[in-house]
Design a protein with these regions (language model features):
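Intrinsic disorder/low-complexity segments
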Residues: 1-35
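Membrane-interface elements of multi-pass transporters and channels
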Residues: 4, 56-57
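Intrinsically disordered, low-complexity segments enriched in proline/serine/threonine
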Residues: 18-21, 27, 72, 132, ...
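A short, solvent-exposed beta-edge/loop patch
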Residues: 35-48, 54-55, 146-244
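Alpha-helical transmembrane signal-anchor/signal-peptide segments
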Residues: 57-73
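Envelope-exposed proteins and targeting segments
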Residues: 72, 98, 109, 204-206
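Short, solvent-exposed recognition patches
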Residues: 79-196
């Protein structure tokens, strides 16, 4: 019996039988039309519709390749480009990536930029949170907090993370880019995937992450400023590569 059915025994003594009962529903039938049963039916129908949508291929979205990402971003210029190891790519399963190091002025610590784009997150390929990836690479997260980021005339949030590995200390800034949204919270980003899959037949998105080392005796505010300046320049062009 379904979840909406009332549990217990049916009182046959109070259930009409015979020819006179054939033209009208029984009291037990009315029980099956209870609000709980109707709600269960709607939920089941919604789940079936969601499954059907998930099984449909999401349409390709026009975008520029990350290999074309600007080498000059405001006052920063690219000094190095790297490739991700094949075994790491097999785990992350991105559609497109870029890994670069940018510098602003001589003697200042570099800022690394990592962007991963996933064209379809309805199946195995999904954004991997740095909260998991950084510890997996041997980094210990010592602090994490959200900070404001200017985005499209308003304010969004990114994650500022301080990490350590032995004597090496770095500061990271990252967010999830979700169809024109800058999102700090991974669970909110996952909710947006389902929303956009229904509303727009899209489940694409990406991760944008910056990291910089602390110079000797450098304060966190100084390293944070370096990350924010490059992040602001990146936000000016990111929609070409991770579409709105």
């Amino acid at each position: 019996m379904g979840h909406g059915a009332v549990q217990g025994k049916v009182d046959l003594g109070n259930t009409p039988v015979g020819p006179r009962a054939a033209g009208r529903p029984s009291a037990f039938a009315f029980r099956l039309l209870s609000p709980t049963a109707l709600l269960f039916s709607y939920l089941l129908l919604g789940a079936l519709l969601a499954l059907a949508l998930l099984q449909r291929a999401t349409p390709a979205v026009a975008r520029a390749q990350l290999a074309e990402f600007p080498k000059e971003l405001g006052a920063f210029h690219m000094i190095q480009e790297s490739e991700i190891a094949p075994n790491i790519l097999a785990i992350l399963q991105p559609t497109d990536t870029v890994v670069r190091a940018y510098a602003r002025q001589p003697g200042e610590p570099l800022v690394s930029l990592y962007i991963a784009y996933h064209a379809d997150q309805s199946e195995g390929s999904r954004v991997h949170s740095p909260k998991s990836c950084l510890p997996g690479a041997g980094w210990q997260i010592t602090t994490i907090k959200t900070i404001p980021l200017a985005w499209k005339g308003g304010e969004s949030k990114g994650n500022l993370v301080r990490v350590e590995k032995g004597l090496d200390k770095q500061l990271a800034l990252y967010w999830i880019h979700s169809n024109g949204r800058v999102v700090a919270n991974e669970y909110v980003a996952r909710a947006y995937i389902f929303h956009d899959l229904f509303a727009r037949r899209r489940s694409d998105g990406g991760l944008v992450r910056f990291m910089t080392v602390f110079a000797p005796e450098e304060r966190e505010e100084s390293a944070k400023e370096r990350l924010l300046v490059l992040a602001e320049a990146t936000l000016q062009v990111i929609s070409r590569y991770i579409p709105d």
